[in-house]
Regions:
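An alpha-helical support segment within catalytic cores of ATP-dependent transferases
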Residues: 2-9, 115-187, 281
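Conserved N-terminal boundary motif of the eukaryotic protein kinase catalytic domain
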Residues: 12-19
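A general structural signal marking secondary-structure boundaries and capping sites
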Residues: 67, 111-118, 155, 180, ...
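Active-site Asp-x-Gly
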Residues: 132-144, 153, 184-187, 194, ...
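Short, basic/aromatic-enriched C-terminal tail that caps enzymatic domains
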Residues: 269-282
Length: 282
């Protein structure tokens, strides 16, 4: 059945136009225009990334429960081959200083949402990679066992890392007890680069494509520093509301190891030098 017909049957609306959207590295993404509404449609294989959109829906709902904004979920369904997620389409606007204040407020709402343990009741995805969220008592244990070690193993299996790299990681692990902050778990977005933050009406920040878990909140702060696209002053607003532990700037390179390793696996060896610089430093 053609895609247009599949979606019309689910929405009970006639589609005027279907247009591809950029940013579909993992999913096929479309803008759907009907007589009365505009939607975002995401399509993915049901066999390659099982329950990806179910996990995305749960992540969006968890973020929304904090009071932070996400697109409205319209429908999630599947057929024998594909899974489909239909969301509200967000018309983005240009931003001013108030947007970044609002972003800081929203991020604090996420990060003040806590849990007894680090991790999550279910696994999910970061990009196209499986993310193991088995719960742990300490951030150090979770960071090593659930974040760094799984992607180090994948990178090693792909010949992107060697034995010397593994040895350097082991040396780093022995020092993390003295480096990582001790704070209660925070709900984190988990993949907070600028492409996953939309600029909605009324200077409203809207979070998309979450990879949530309960972790140390500095992982989100780190992601905002990784690729740019965030006003540098937002962190001042954030710190007024929920001050970060002293030394957070120095810990950015440690927390950056996880997204850097994910990018090493997904996009190749251009990320290796930055990883080596950090693990050899310690």
């Amino acid at each position: 059945m053609p895609l247009k017909e599949i979606i019309e049957n689910e929405l009970s609306e006639s589609i005027i136009k279907i247009a591809p959207l950029s940013g579909g590295d993992i999913n096929e993404v479309f803008k759907i225009i009907t007589q009365n509404n505009t939607y975002v449609l995401k399509v993915n294989s049901i066999s390659i990334h099982p329950k990806m959109f179910v996990k995305e829906k749960l992540g969006l709902q968890s973020i929304s429960l904090t009071g932070a904004k996400t697109p409205n979920l319209i429908k999630i369904f599947s057929n024998s081959q594909n899974q489909f997620l239909i969301l509200e389409y967000i018309e983005e606007e240009s931003t001013n200083k108030s947007f970044w204040k609002n972003f800081a407020i929203s991020l604090v709402k996420l990060h003040k949402t806590s849990n007894k343990r680090f991790g999550l009741e279910y696994d999910n995805y970061i990009g196209s990679l499986h993310q193991n969220n088995a719960q742990k008592r300490t951030w150090e244990q979770f960071f090593i066992e659930n974040r760094i070690n799984p992607v180090v193993k994948q990178a090693f299996d792909k010949n992107l890392l060697n034995i010397n790299h593994l040895s350097s990681f082991e040396s780093l692990f022995k020092k993390l007890n003295e480096i990582l902050p001790i704070e209660p778990p925070s709900l984190v977005h988990g993949d907070l680069w600028s492409g996953n933050l939309l600029k909605g009406k009324g200077q409203t920040p809207i979070f998309i494509d979450p990879a949530i878990y309960y972790g140390n909140r500095e992982v989100d702060i780190t992601m905002t520093q990784m690729f740019g696209g965030f006003d540098k002053n937002y962190i001042n607003y954030y710190n007024e509301l929920f001050p970060l532990e002293p030394g957070w700037q120095q810990r950015i390179e440690i927390h950056n190891l996880y997204p850097s390793l994910v990018h090493l696996i997904l996009f190749g060896s251009s990320y290796l030098r930055g990883i080596e610089k950090v693990i050899n430093k310690f």
